[in-house]
Each structure stands twice: as C-alpha cells, then as structure tokens.
Regions:
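Extended, Lys/Arg-enriched charged tracts that mediate electrostatic binding to polyanionic substrates
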Residues: 4-12, 20-39, 130-132, 137-147, ...
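Conserved RNase H-like, two-metal-ion catalytic cores of nucleic-acid enzymes
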Residues: 9, 15-107
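Short active-site loop/helix that positions an aromatic residue
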Residues: 117-126, 302-316
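Common nucleic-acid-contacting/processivity interface regions adjacent to the catalytic cores
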Residues: 200-312, 371-409
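Conserved catalytic core of nucleic-acid polymerases
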Residues: 1, 5, 301-304, 314-315, ...
C-alpha cells in the first residue's frame, strides 16, 4: 500500500498535506545559446560544435547579460544590459558557469530548452572536458538522455522549464507552428531580429546585430512568460498538488500527489498496478443535420464530468461488484454505494467550493487590486485539477484506476 511513492513525493505529502507550500519568489535565468555551424550541423548528443554566444536574463537583477566570443567589441554596458566578451570559448563558458554559481538561480528557462539548449550546453562542457557540475547546486554531474521525442535533462538543484513545452500544454487550440517566431508573432505581435544569410555570416560581418539577435530571442522568451504567466501557472499547480516541477506536465502525477495528500491520515491508498491498456466507449456524439439554420442555441454544462462523478458518488472504493440496498444503479451495469461519501466526490467538492470562493473574492476586490491576479491563477488551477481528475480515472497507470468508473461516466 503506497509502497511505490518515491521519497521526495512522500516528504512533500508528509510535510504539506495540511498546509500550503509557500509562494516564494523564484529566481529565474532565461537563456539562449548560439552555436557555430561552420564545422557542420551541431550534434546535440555530443556537443561537437562551439558555442559562440550566450544571452540570458536574470529575474532578480532584471538585467540582460551576454557572454560571447569576440576579438573586438564596441558595445557598451547599460542599466539593463551587460556584455562580456572573451577570446576563447573555454574562457566564455568558464565565466558563464561562474555567473551561474554567483547568482544561484532556482530555475533555467528557454524556448525548446529540453530539445536543444539544455542538452547541448551539458554535452558541450563534457566535450571540452570542463566541469559541468558547476551548472548544478550540489556538485552533481548534469544528466541528459535521448528519448523518442527529445531529451530528458536534469541539472541537480535547479528546475528546467521549457517554454515551448509549457506553451503547448496551455494553448487551447493547436498552432500552425510552435517556433519562437510564430508564437511570438501570435501572442505578442512582434518577432525575432531579422537578418540575411547565415548566422555565422552575421557573426563575422555584423557582430552588433548578431548580439541583438541573441538578446532578442531571450527578450521574447521573457515577454511570453510575463504575458502568459506560464511559470506562475505551473508553479500554482505544483504548490496546490504538492508535487515536483517535473511532474506538472503529467496530469496523472499531479492528481496522484493531490489525492495522496488529501487522503493522508484518513486512508491508505493502494500502490499503482501495471494494468494493461484497456479501451472503453466514450460519449455518444450526435451528427448534426447538414444545412444553414436560424435561431441556433448552444448549451454548456458547468463542470459536467466532475458533476457526474459527484452526483453518482463515483470512486474506486465506492464501486460495488454486486448491488446493495439503496445503492446508485447506472444501467443495471455499474453500482455505487451511498453508505459513505467517495474520496473523489469529497475532493472535487472541496476544489469546486474553493474555486467559487476565489471567484467571489475576485468580484469583491476588482481587477485593480494586487490580490486579483493571484486569485485568478488559483481559480484556474482548481478548474484544471477538477477536469484532470476525470481524465486520469480512465488511465490504467492511475492509483485508483478502474475501467468501470470511466465507462460509467
């Protein structure tokens, strides 16, 4: 029972099941690498081509910092920008690592960070036989592993968040492209620094513009996060569900942590089982008649799936194999006891009531109040958690999985 809960998740549950995780100010380092292609297309798995520039933004310093290889430079520092130029890549990377050690960021962010920047800088440092442990907080060697759809990266003591990955998770509709240029134009109405030829040619012929290009990418990454509040959103999920940052992209892990904390000191939950994937019939969709119609109405049921689960007291522990007196009977196929309130019903009701309280408070204080944005983030997070509970009920790897519940819904 609960034998599969890893140490970190167990500690989060034990220490914070009945209290909030503090909303700390996260020190974020947004960064972007520029890599030379004169020697060929860079191999991410080996880091075989030199890094020629690193632009970053520190959220505490509120400043853009550039580390680059340059023989001569005429760019001067300002209040919002600092430039550091070096003769060799080793010297540049050494100073960047020292900057990371000195500023000690909680989080690295980038656009396509998992797919390029994070694995590349880790592997480039290894290629050069430099001390990659200086990227971490605890003198541990960073890890990067090739997966089917990218890389799994870990820098110990620091969170890695890929803005492209966050954006894909948050965007309600699929985009034509998820490139930084397309998303920036779509969300901000502005895009990357334009240039002709190759980036290596720009580096050689117009170094100032090359640096502007590198900085501009980081500016767009910062602006996207400021507008869409992506880090705030996923941090809100993390704190509410009491899970790790790397878990927030998987609804099953988020809800698992949420339910473990909710049941702490009340119930001991079963360990996860390796169930075979099963299919079940979903909702019946009626095909509309063809043609053009007047007076068309559109109905939306508020929190339909969570409401169904609460109305019929659905959960792993209330599902009956055989009917009992007074039980809930669905199509003479699925039976749920009414002798006790289900875990999922109680949890859903608490989330819905708490969300309603947030929305009432928002109306009372108005958008000009400093508390408004925090409440708005809170109520959206609770909405997502409610919908995610339904989503994981039919997932075979869920701790409280039972296909009959998914079918009954």
């Amino acid at each position: 029972m609960e034998a599969d809960v890893i140490f970190v998740n167990r500690a989060l549950c034990d220490f914070y099941h009945n209290k909030e995780i503090p909303n700390e100010d996260i020190r974020k380092l947004y960064f972007d690498l520029e890599v030379s292609m004169l020697g060929g297309v860079p191999d991410i798995e080996t880091g075989d081509q030199p890094i020629i520039s690193i632009a970053c933004y520190d959220s505490f310093l509120k400043k853009y910092i550039v580390f680059a290889i340059a023989k001569e430079q005429k760019i001067t520092n300002g209040k919002t920008h600092s430039y550091f130029f070096y003769k060799t890549e080793r010297e540049m990377l050494s100073k960047f690592l020292q900057f990371v050690q000195d500023t000690d960021p909680d989080m690295f962010l980038g656009y396509n960070l998992d797919g390029f920047d994070a694995p590349y800088i880790i592997n480039r440092l290894k290629w050069l036989k430099m001390d990659a442990t200086k990227l971490s907080r605890c003198c541990e060697m960073p890890r990067t592993e090739k997966e089917d759809f990218g890389f799994r990266n870990k820098i110990f003591g620091r969170v890695l968040l890929d803005e492209m990955k966050m954006y894909k998770k948050l965007a309600l509709n699929k985009r034509e492209s998820y490139s930084l240029e397309y998303v920036s134009q779509y969300e901000l109405g502005e895009g990357k620094e334009k240039y002709e030829g190759t980036l290596d040619e720009l580096y050689e012929k117009d170094f100032d513009r090359f640096i502007r290009y590198n900085i501009r990418d980081v500016e767009l990454i910062v602006l996207l996060d400021e507008k869409l509040r992506m880090v705030d959103y996923f941090d809100s999920i993390r704190r509410m569900a009491k899970c790790k940052f790397e878990d927030v992209f998987m609804n099953s892990r988020v809800i698992d942590s949420l339910i473990l904390c909710f049941c702490k000191d009340k119930y001991v939950l079963p360990s996860k089982k390796r169930n075979a994937e099963e299919t079940f019939e979903g909702a019946f969709v009626v095909q509309p008649p063809k043609g053009l119609f007047d007076m068309v109405g559109w109905l939306d049921v508020k929190a339909m799936y969570p409401s169904i689960m609460m109305t019929f007291n659905m959960s792993y522990e209330t599902l009956l194999d055989v009917p009992e007196e007074g039980c809930i009977n669905i199509d003479n196929k699925y039976y749920f006891t009414t002798k006790r309130t289900s875990i999922l019903k109680t949890l859903l009701q608490q989330l819905i009531d708490s969300r309603d309280d947030d929305k009432k408070r928002m109306k009372q204080i108005g958008e000009s109040n400093a508390e408004f944005k925090s409440l708005d983030m809170s109520q959206w997070t609770k909405k997502l958690l409610c919908n995610s509970i339904f989503g994981v009920v039919g997932f075979s790897g869920f701790r409280l999985y039972n296909i009959k519940i998914a079918e009954a819904i």
